A protein has these predicted regions:
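N-terminal nucleophile
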Residues: 1-254
Length: 254
């Protein structure tokens, strides 16, 4: 299941930043972020799932927004008309700012939606749809509730992420320029990236691992990509990296 670490800092130049690890079956085809949906125009980009046609993570400009969907662990009964893809949710949230309402026809999900005003999480567990506004500070989302300490990797790593400096902006500026006063500042993402590197010392199938890999019904399932996202009043930045199954993070953040 995916993992998202998000920092909410009201009043700052970049009020919401988040790190997302996308976990998926390795042979499910997907594409790196781009404007894959002509009906949404050039302002909406996302990590496209070719199989279902939606997005795992989407960003939009004018106004600046970002949204990412995570699968929950519950298995609701299928609706009469069949399932719709969860991948439509971040596209809608990024494009319009709207969160889902009514009774969703998707499988269970957590949906993070971020803009300059903060971050909200819509959760559907098959029984009810709830929405919460994240308090200032650092939070971790997985397949359970927000900051769910019953999830082993949340229990281990949430205190660690809260114990280091959170990023203050995008990791890179236009054309790869540094965002900080010194070369290599990278928006002060290094403390979070250092924790990711530390987490890879665990076996990839360990319950507390952040960067994950395991066999699921004979198919390799694991962390396929890493996204670093920052949202300001008028900009959204998304730095995206494919991860190597054999050596995740090596070569990107060594």
């Amino acid at each position: 299941m995916c993992t998202v670490v998000v920092s909410v800092a009201p009043g700052s130049a970049w009020p919401v930043v988040f790190l997302g690890l996308r976990d998926e079956v390795a042979d499910r085809p997907w594409d790196a972020p781009a404007a894959w949906w002509p009906e949404l125009g050039d302002r909406v980009e996302g990590v496209r799932d070719r199989e279902a046609g939606g997005a795992w993570l989407a960003t939009a400009t004018a106004p600046a927004r970002a949204s990412v969907v995570l699968n929950r662990r519950e298995e609701p009964a299928p609706p009469a008309g069949g399932w719709t893809t969860r991948g439509a949710l971040p596209l809608s949230a990024a494009a319009s700012g709207a969160l889902p309402g009514g009774r969703p026809t998707t499988r269970a999900f957590n949906l993070l939606a971020a803009d300059a005003d903060g971050a909200r999480v819509a959760s559907w567990d098959g029984a009810g749809l709830t929405t919460e506004t994240l308090a200032p500070g650092v939070h971790v989302l997985t397949h359970g509730s927000t900051d769910d300490l019953d999830v082993p990797r949340v229990a281990r790593w949430l205190p660690r992420f809260r114990g280091v400096e959170a990023p203050t902006g995008p990791p890179t500026g236009p054309a790869g320029a540094s965002t900080g006063p010194d070369d290599g500042d990278r928006g002060r993402w290094e403390p979070w990236l250092a924790l990711l590197r530390e987490s890879t010392e665990l076996p990839a199938d360990h319950d507390e691992a952040l960067v994950r890999a395991d066999l699921l019904d004979g198919r390799w399932f694991g962390s396929l990509s890493l996204s670093l996202v920052a949202v300001s009043a008028d900009q959204v930045r998304h730095e995206h990296h494919r991860l190597d199954r054999a050596s995740p993070l090596v070569g990107h953040f060594a």
